């Protein structure tokens, strides 16, 4: 499984280098948390590579909210060109991954926030044995509140991938307290032009360590 493919400036280069270095020849599940260009930047290149030079992609999972960017159009063109199965994925769906349980907790139906892409990210809880991971895409306060209200303690996870690159609009106190992670991973540029991750969010996690 591959979740998101990075910024459009990189065009999937670093993701592909990593996959090739680890002898990955097939992606059974390609998950697009949401269709912002900093999350789908490598989708087209990765689809092209795996469908023409490797062993293909089993299926793509997408929340179904379009973006008006060239990056998004190139992604859809690659899906169509190579006839890859594309699922519009919503809360309650499951992804078959053998003995590992993958539950889709978002986006809900109907969508939140007038179809805002961040607030309707695909949110996955992945559980293998005693270890669990919560991947929250770019979920912000409203989607986090929905998740807390809907799932409560079911959100508890060993590892949290913090929402929206550690932005102040995500990782709200009620959400962090409910997930109660032992480890937090923040994906962000080293010197983000947006100031991600924010000191407030970093301190929030530090206070709970």
Model regions and ranges:
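Non-globular, low-confidence helical/coil segments that flank catalytic cores
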Residues: 1-209
């Amino acid at each position: 499984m591959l979740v998101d493919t990075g910024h459009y400036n990189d065009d999937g280069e670093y993701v592909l280098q990593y996959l090739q270095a680890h002898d990955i020849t097939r992606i059974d599940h390609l998950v697009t948390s949401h269709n912002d260009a900093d999350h789908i930047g490598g989708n087209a290149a990765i689809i092209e590579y795996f469908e023409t030079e490797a062993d293909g992609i089993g299926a793509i999972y997408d929340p179904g909210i379009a973006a008006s960017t060239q990056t998004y159009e190139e992604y859809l063109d690659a899906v169509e060109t190579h006839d890859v199965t594309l699922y519009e994925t919503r809360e309650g769906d499951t992804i078959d991954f053998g003995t590992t349980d993958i539950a889709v907790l978002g986006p809900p139906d109907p969508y939140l926030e007038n179809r805002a892409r961040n607030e309707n990210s695909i949110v996955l809880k992945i559980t293998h044995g005693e270890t669990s991971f919560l991947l929250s895409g770019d979920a912000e306060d409203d989607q986090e509140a929905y998740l807390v209200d809907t799932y409560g303690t079911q959100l508890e996870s060993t590892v949290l991938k913090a929402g929206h690159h550690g932005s102040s609009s995500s990782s709200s106190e009620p959400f962090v307290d409910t997930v109660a992670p032992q480890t937090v991973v923040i994906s962000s540029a080293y010197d983000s032009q947006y100031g991600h991750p924010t000191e407030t969010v970093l301190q929030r996690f530090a206070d709970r360590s």
